[in-house]
Each structure stands twice: as C-alpha cells, then as structure tokens.
Curated annotation (Swiss-Prot):
Disulfide bonds: none annotated. Its main location: cytoplasm. Residues 105-115, 124-135 have a biased composition (Basic residues). Component of the small ribosomal subunit (SSU). Mature yeast ribosomes consist of a small (40S) and a large (60S) subunit. The 40S small subunit contains 1 molecule of ribosomal RNA (18S rRNA) and 33 different proteins (encoded by 57 genes). The large 60S subunit contains 3 rRNA molecules (25S, 5.8S and 5S rRNA) and 46 different proteins (encoded by 81 genes). GO terms for biological process: cytoplasmic translation; maturation of SSU-rRNA from tricistronic rRNA transcript (SSU-rRNA, 5.8S rRNA, LSU-rRNA). Residues 102-135 are annotated as: Disordered. This is Small ribosomal subunit protein eS24A. There are 2 genes for eS24 in yeast. Keywords: Acetylation, Cytoplasm, Isopeptide bond, Phosphoprotein, Ribonucleoprotein, Ribosomal protein, Ubl conjugation. The gene is RPS24A. It comes from Saccharomyces cerevisiae (strain ATCC 204508 / S288c).
Length: 135
C-alpha cells in the first residue's frame, strides 16, 4: 500500500452560508484498486488545516481501467457546523451521530391501521382505559 496517491482539488468554492468550502476531488491511484474515504478525509484535513471530522467526501466514481477517481468534497469551518448541515446518514458513517432505529415498515402500517379502527368518543374512552390499565 505504499503506492503514491495524488489528490487534486478543483472548482473550489467558498460557501459562507453553509460555513464550508466545497470542491471536486481528483484522486490518482495507479497500481491500486482504490483509496478509502477515511484516508481521503485525513489527507484533505491536512491540506485544508481542518479537523478530520469537519471533512466530508462522497460521490466517488472510478474511471474505467482504474487509476483515477473523481468525487466531491466538503470542508466545514468546524465540527459543529458539519453536524448542523451534513445529512444524518453521512454523520452516522463518520461516527458523529447515532443511527435512529425505527419500527419496521410492516409494524408501522399495522399500528396505523389499528389506530384507524377506533375514532371519535370511542377513541377518547380507549385512551382512558389504556391509561388506567397501564397504572
């Protein structure tokens, strides 16, 4: 894994509204399958003098034949800004947020349909009975 990897950034735009720099990342990786996003985040953090957690990379496509990948990168001014503006699924990937576990689709539908069966005054009474039974 000691093969040289070259990272170039182009189309660098400073986005003050979202407190970040955004750019296209070109990665040259000859004699190597690909470069991990984690490794790219580390190297970009060095280049832009930012924390690794404030750097986000995504959308990488490897050219046919390998050796070159192109993707998109974001460097936020701070980790707090990254947590504020980045989508939750990316924060989960980077270990900055917990994944929200929700009931399965089938369970949600079954609950919705159960709730539809009781309505009006009966619904009020059903809630009252459920509360009384819970105590």
């Amino acid at each position: 894994m000691s093969d040289a990897v070259t990272i170039r950034t182009r189309k660098v735009i400073s986005n003050p509204l979202l407190a970040r720099k955004q750019f296209v990342v070109d990665v040259l990786h000859p004699n190597r399958a690909n470069v991990s996003k984690d490794e790219l985040r580390e190297k970009l953090a060095e280049v832009y003098k930012a924390e690794k957690d404030a750097v986000s990379v995504f959308g990488f496509r490897t050219q046919f034949g390998g050796g070159k990948s192109v993707g998109f990168g974001l460097v936020y001014n701070s980790v707090a800004e990254a947590k504020k503006f980045e989508p939750t699924y990316r924060l989960v990937r980077y270990g900055l947020a917990e994944k929200v576990e929700k009931a399965s689709r089938q369970q949600r539908k079954q609950k919705k349909n159960r709730d539809k069966k009781i309505f009006g005054t009966g619904k009020r009474l059903a809630k009252k009975v459920a509360r009384r039974n819970a105590d």
